[in-house]
Swiss-Prot record:
It comes from Salmonella paratyphi B (strain ATCC BAA-1250 / SPB7). This is Phosphoenolpyruvate carboxykinase (ATP). Substrate binds at residues 64, 206, 212, 332. It is found in: Cytoplasm. One of its GO terms (biological process) is gluconeogenesis. Pfam families: PEPCK_ATP. Belongs to the phosphoenolpyruvate carboxykinase (ATP) family. The lineage of its organism: Bacteria, Pseudomonadati, Pseudomonadota, Gammaproteobacteria, Enterobacterales.
Length: 539
């Protein structure tokens, strides 16, 4: 149903001229036909899988390009944004001049001019009073499919007279040949102008740039209004008890919040205001590497018609090899949230959170599977945002690579991290919420803590049995660990037990503690940050 009389003439206001045709808010059936059009070439063309979902490739860009992210520095942003060239903390918010912005905008509008375009109008944010109305403009059908999956789909009534607050122009096929003279990182770019309220994409086909681009914008707008903006998943129990799960990619946010006993609010991006927790999105973007029907049935069954697979290996018979990471370990699927049966309806929001869970995948094997945090430890570990990855080396030796990402999402923060911590703590205090640190990574055995044990730990947090358990303190990190929990092997609760000797743990723990201390140094330039040092490890 065409409910918005958008014409090529309207696009001239954006600098896009001579548009051949507009496919406005296409249906899933239309997108399916467009993506599988045999006349398409290269990364535009989709492949049908035996699961019913279309699969696409994003080329060399199988993840975001943080080094190619820029924000126009002007009167709107000069004094509010967390800039990469100011202060101690490193981030991806590189300043862009107005002159270079105009050049990039010209490249993208030229690329989109004279084309047949897909335009998707959608919402970012489930609360009507704080949501963004976003217009996505692309020449690629599957990119329109991606944003239709990931953002909140308006009703026909809401599309009448839709006025965008933000425009995303995706010119994936164009690059910037003048990047060197302009002092940029490469010919590719993901640029934002918060005054004009436009995002430009050039050179990268990765769909996640549109998703995380809008997250970065929400991360700018909401905390300035006192609303928490969070890189987390969220779900709600039968009694209305809400839990949020913070964590970097690969720590288990999507897996652990997709729980048959609880209704899903969302799997990645949320706000927390005076009414409670609400989703920014209308879909899920799940990792699929080594996905199995047995371990993650809800996600597996969500991969059907209207879902969109990215960078997976599709065999000649249409079956998908989820174990093959030859294109990338970051294989993904996007699907509308209603592909998960157990969701909050009709709007993805619920009350205030009472359980706040920080997920870390510690490849050093030092941190306990679970610990209960004090108020100061909550802020310390939120600002630290620690996880660690196992990276294979040429000789097959695996050494852990530590990652400290402020607020478990530094790549998407547009304000200083302490602003997010302050807003979160205020919301937690008002709701009487308790925080926990959960390690979904490794221990001294060299094996990853099983999903079965981690799920039992999450159950113990959510049903309150962990709060009633006896605890002991782990040296160096001063973390409160339960002595036993239902359904969890007691032996693994103390990470020292999983080593051949306590001295081995002590050696690794000392090395990790030093990394925490070095990382937190960047927050000690404020009295609030200095006061939190004592909540971290002590050597």
């Amino acid at each position: 149903m065409r409910v918005n009389n958008l014409t090529p003439q309207d696009l001239k206001a954006y600098g896009i001229n001579d548009v051949q045709d507009i496919v406005y808010n296409p249906s899933y059936d239309t997108l399916y036909q467009e993506e599988l059009n045999p006349g398409l070439e290269g990364y535009e063309r989709g492949v049908l899988t035996n699961l019913g979902a279309v699969a696409v490739d994003t080329g060399i860009f199988t993840g975001r390009s943080p080094k190619d992210k820029y924000i126009v520095r002007d009167d709107t942003t000069r004094d509010t944004l967390w800039w990469s060239d100011k202060g101690k903390g490193k981030n991806d918010n590189k300043p862009l001049s107005q002159e270079t912005w105009q050049h990039l905008k010209g490249l993208v509008t030229h690329q989109l001019s004279g084309k047949r375009l897909f335009i998707v109008d959608a919402f970012c944010g489930a609360n009507a009073d704080t949501r963004l109305s976003v217009r996505f403009i692309t020449e690629v059908a599957w990119q329109a499919h991606f944003v239709k999956n990931m953002f909140i789909r308006p009703t026909d009534e809401e599309l009448v007279g839709f006025k965008p607050d933000f425009i995303v122009m995706n010119g994936a096929k164009c690059t910037n040949p003048q990047w060197k003279e302009q002092g940029l990182n490469s010919e590719n770019f993901v640029a934002f102008n918060l005054t004009e309220r436009i995002q430009l994409i050039g050179g990268t086909w990765y769909g996640g740039e549109m998703k995380k681009g809008m997250f970065s914008v929400m991360n700018y707008l909401l905390p300035l209004k006192g609303i928490a903006s969070m890189h987390c998943s969220a779900n709600v129990g039968e009694k209305g008890d809400v839990a949020v799960f913070f964590g970097l990619s690969g720590t288990g946010k999507t897996t652990l919040s997709t729980d048959p006993k609880r209704r899903l609010i969302g799997d990645d991006e949320h706000g927390w205001d005076d009414d409670g927790v609400f989703n920014f999105e209308g879909g899920c973007y799940a990792k699929t590497i080594k996905l199995s029907k047995e371990a993650e049935p809800e996600i597996y069954h969500a991969i059907r018609r209207d879902a969109l697979l990215e960078n997976v290996t599709v065999r000649e018979d249409g079956t998908v090899d989820f174990d093959d990471g030859s294109k990338t370990e970051n294989t993904r699927v996007s699907y509308p949230i209603y592909h998960i049966d157990n969701i909050v309806k009709p709007v993805s929001k619920a009350g205030h959170a009472t359980k706040v869970i920080f997920l870390t995948a510690d490849a050093f094997g030092v941190l306990p599977p679970v610990s209960r945090l004090t108020a100061n430890q909550t802020q310390y570990h939120f600002l630290s945002g620690f996880t660690a990855k196992l990276a294979g080396t040429e000789r097959g030796v695996t050494e852990p690579t530590p990652t400290f990402s402020a607020c478990f999402g530094a790549a998407f923060l547009t304000l200083h991290p302490t602003q997010y911590a302050e807003v979160l703590v205020k919301r937690m205090q008002a709701a009487g919420a308790q925080a926990y640190l959960v390690n979904t990574g490794w221990n001294g055995t060299g094996k990853r803590i099983s999903i079965k044990d981690t799920r039992a730990i999450i159950d113990a947090i959510l049903n309150g049995s962990l709060d009633n358990a006896e605890t002991f303190r782990l040296p160096l990190f001063d973390l409160a660990i339960p002595t036993e929990l239902p359904g969890v092997d007691t032996h693994i609760l103390d990470p020292r037990n999983t080593y051949a000797s306590p001295e081995q743990w002590q050696e690794k723990a000392t090395a990790l503690a030093k990394l925490f201390i070095e990382n937190f140094e960047k927050y000690t330039d404020t009295p609030a940050g200095e006061a939190l040092v004592s909540a971290g490890p002590k050597l």
